[in-house]
């Protein structure tokens, strides 16, 4: 029963990516990585799609420090700092809460009755495609290091924007 908690955790993390650095199409590989996990937990591909794509898009819509729209727009408007930051965080929290509730409601319905999924027929084929074989190596040290470097890099960008007022040149 606790696997359902993975939905809000992932959506919040991806939403933070959307709101801070404009994560958008960068999430496509996450779909491929997460779909077998969510299949194994009894969910459908639409649940995985909503988690991976709605999370960052909600973040992008309520951008806080996203250099691709907030910082450029504020620069063009001559606004220094980020005076609407608190409002944007509140708006992000409201939109994320509503979206997470919707996705969790859908996911629980599908888990209870898989044939009610709008992607049921397609998922039967996808489940065969994503079956693991003995050649799969799992999550290696190299994979962990790549994720660590990515996370540190994103953290540095967010820190630079918030603490030092970095703009496009510094990023």
Can you name each region flagged by the protein language model?
Residues 2, 44, 80, 140, ...:
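Helix N-cap and loop-to-helix transition residues
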Residues 2-60:
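Hydrophobic transmembrane alpha-helices that form the pore/transport pathway of multi-pass ion
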Residues 12-15, 19, 52, 56, ...:
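Generic detector of intrinsically disordered, low-complexity, polar/charged segments
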Residues 17-26, 69, 158-169:
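Transmembrane helix-loop junctions in multi-pass membrane proteins
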Residues 36-120, 137:
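Membrane-core helix-loop-helix motifs of multi-pass transport proteins
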Residues 85-171:
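Long, contiguous bundles of hydrophobic transmembrane helices that form the permeation core
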